[in-house]
Design a protein with these regions (language model features):
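Noncatalytic modules at the cell exterior or secretory-pathway interfaces
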Residues: 239, 419-422
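Beta-propeller and closely related beta-sheet repeat lectin domains
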Residues: 120, 179-181, 226-229, 276-279, ...
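Beta-rich carbohydrate-recognition and catalytic domains
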Residues: 79-113, 118-129, 133-173, 184-223, ...
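Single-pass membrane-anchoring alpha-helices
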Residues: 2-38
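Serine/threonine-rich low-complexity intrinsically disordered regions
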Residues: 52-77
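Surface-exposed, short loops/turns at beta-strand junctions within beta-sandwich domains
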Residues: 414-418
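Membrane-proximal alpha-helical anchors
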Residues: 32-51, 80
């Protein structure tokens, strides 16, 4: 074979190999694409179902003429499917509470457009915490802010922001409400929003951004709810609602809600005489609430909710150091585990407490007769003994001379346990401060800690002389 024939032969062989490789790559590409689309064809869900993301193997072949290179295998990363929360972890052991968040809304409103609010609270989804409040349909530096001490108007809406973000003009108005509760079941938010006439109000149940159910006032006397987070366990959410006399016998019901739909209603049973503005927390397998007795007791009512059989048991926090305002001073106060103590029972303020074995953690105003100052502490045997007055681990959150307001609890699930946190409403303006014509608030938030902590005071801090009148 002469040199020219050798060159022609080698060229022919190379061309043949290249052609074969080319067609092999086309075949591999066609097979890969076909298999990819076949997967979605065979796994496509019905029209009314959400398609779940599943890991997919994708082959990518990098080709150069003549030579076949390595094939790389990649996994498609899918979001973890949402699951209902069950809150089955134990409660975290704590030594006290550490500072977590403060929104400074009133101070900031001196130089910007911040909503006029009251009745704030905090609740968390599995990833983030959010702050809520009932807006008054106006900003503070707006003449509509005059006379916003009123609780119920058609302009009030439920506001929602990430925790620590003040309610600015871009804040989402979740629903129309002058009383509310919100909670996340692990998949979506549920909002309970009450508005309308005092004698014929409507509660709307909004789930995942859609109105799902509603209920009308059953006693025609200011239907109202918690003003803090509800609780969802395995897809069933519970909310405590009261309708009727604010200083006498009222009609309290516990609603069980699944994806926004009311599936059951239980009447309050047990020994609690008057129940309003409950602060609820998951106590697996049920829900426990500590509430406000606006009629007979300065000791706080307890409502225990059984998720499975819808049964309700109510009683009172035993602690001899009581949590409501007004109340008697600690040396002369008394309590009872089953009944109201009949001490300074009229009026009151939303508050919280939670059990820790036989002990109880609680927060309350420092002043016994008005909403001034705020403190937290643990009462040894305060969950089981009405004579218990041994207080430990006391912390001042707001000094005695500074204003406070409502307070409530929210729960945060950690890797190994469930932590309890609380917020304090810091009310400013009317009726107590007449330099201005409005009433609004900021908040401060603390969470349980097993570590060490110092001292301080975290009041609202706004100078009303610098504020819009």
């Amino acid at each position: 074979m002469n040199p020219n024939q050798k060159i022609i032969t080698i060229g022919s062989v190379s061309l043949t190999i290249s052609t074969i490789c080319f067609f092999m790559q086309i075949a591999i590409l066609i097979t890969t694409v076909t298999l990819h689309f076949k997967q979605y064809e065979f796994n496509s869900p019905p029209n009314n179902q959400v398609m779940l993301c599943e890991p997919t193997i994708i082959e990518r072949n990098i080709t150069e003429i003549v030579y076949l290179t390595n094939t790389t295998i990649e996994k498609e990363i899918c979001p973890k499917p949402a699951e209902y929360r069950n809150w089955s972890k134990p409660q975290c052991g704590i030594t006290g509470f550490a500072p977590f968040s403060k929104d400074n809304s009133i101070r900031l409103s001196a130089g910007g457009d911040i909503w006029v609010t009251r009745e704030p609270y905090v609740s968390c989804d599995p990833d983030k915490c959010y702050q809520f409040a009932l807006g008054q349909g106006t900003t503070l530096n707006n003449v509509h802010s005059n006379n916003t001490a009123r609780d119920r108007t058609p302009y009030r809406t439920l506001l929602m922001n990430e925790l620590g973000v003040p309610f600015h003009l871009g804040t989402k108005q979740v629903c129309i409400a002058w009383s509310s509760s919100s909670c996340h079941d692990g998949k979506a938010w549920l909002h309970v929003c009450i508005t309308g006439d005092d004698k014929n109000a409507t509660a709307s149940f909004i789930y995942n951004g859609r109105l799902v159910d509603s209920v009308v006032s059953w006693s025609k006397d200011i239907l109202r709810t918690q003003e803090s987070e509800c609780v969802c366990i395995n897809g069933t959410c519970t909310v405590v609602m009261t309708d009727g006399n604010a200083t006498g016998k009222a009609d309290t019901k516990i609603l069980f809600i699944e994806e926004g739909k009311i599936v059951h209603t239980s009447k309050l049973s047990g020994s609690a005489q008057h129940v309003e503005e409950c602060s609820c927390y998951p106590r697996y397998p049920g829900v426990r609430c500590v509430c406000r007795d606006n009629w007979k007791g300065s000791n706080r009512p307890i409502v225990d909710i059984n998720i499975k059989d819808h049964s309700i048991v109510s009683s009172y926090v035993c602690s001899g150091l009581v949590g409501d305002t007004p109340r008697k001073n600690d040396s002369s106060s008394s309590s009872h585990c089953l009944d109201p103590n009949n001490e300074e029972g009229g009026h009151g303020v939303k508050g919280w407490a939670f059990d820790d074995g036989n002990d109880v953690w609680m927060g309350r105003t420092i002043n016994e007769t008005s909403r001034l100052g705020y403190e937290t502490f643990k009462v040894i045997e305060g969950w089981s003994n009405p004579k218990s007055k041994l207080q430990i681990n006391r912390q001042v959150i707001v000094d005695r001379g500074d204003r406070s307001g409502y307070s409530g609890i929210f729960s945060v699930e950690g890797k190994s346990c469930i932590n309890r946190c609380f917020y304090v409403e810091l009310i400013r303006g009317r009726k107590e401060e007449t330099e201005v014509l409005w009433t609004s608030n900021s908040i401060v938030v603390f969470c349980g800690t097993s570590g060490t902590y110092g001292t301080g005071s975290w009041p609202d801090g706004a100078d009303l002389n610098l504020m819009h009148i």
